[in-house]
Amino acid sequence: EERKSKNEEKIIINNLREEFLQIQNDLQLKIDQLNNSKNVVQQLMNLLGKNKTQIKNTNTDSLIYYSLTWPEFNPTSSVLNDLLQSGRLRLITNTDLRKLLFKWTPAIEEVKSQYDEMIRFNNDRVFEYLNKYVSFKNVDNYGMVFWREKSVFKIDHSFLFNQLYYENMLEGQLYFFTESSTS
């Protein structure tokens, strides 16, 4: 019976290892995407207060698009969930590992909560504000929607980059990026 338990523990640990390696790879990709978005927001911050020519010579539609692209981290934890639900977590004899596994779900919930807060900020504040000053038809050309022509409306982003309110929006985004990268 003990040998059977040891073999089952080895299988469980191997499955957990594979799952966590995949999560680690996914997490690194999300961190890279998050850092890219953070860098774009910093580029937008650097345009604040610049003259009309400097702003016009920058592809602000592209920067705005990428500043709004925030990666979601939603790892699968099927092996761990199965262990928790079946009670087989008791088969893991390493107490430190068991403690870490118990902390995993709350840690993921915290990350999801931060992501939801970032999305609410973007949707409720940033998008609402940008709707008044940018053409999302132009901005979306850098995402999954490719328009053949730009907006029929003349868009001048220099007004946007001379607004304290927009600076505060960008600073808010940087706050969330920084908070996310320290969790």
What is each model feature region?
Residues E2-S183:
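Long, hydrophobic alpha-helical segments that serve as membrane-spanning/inserting helices
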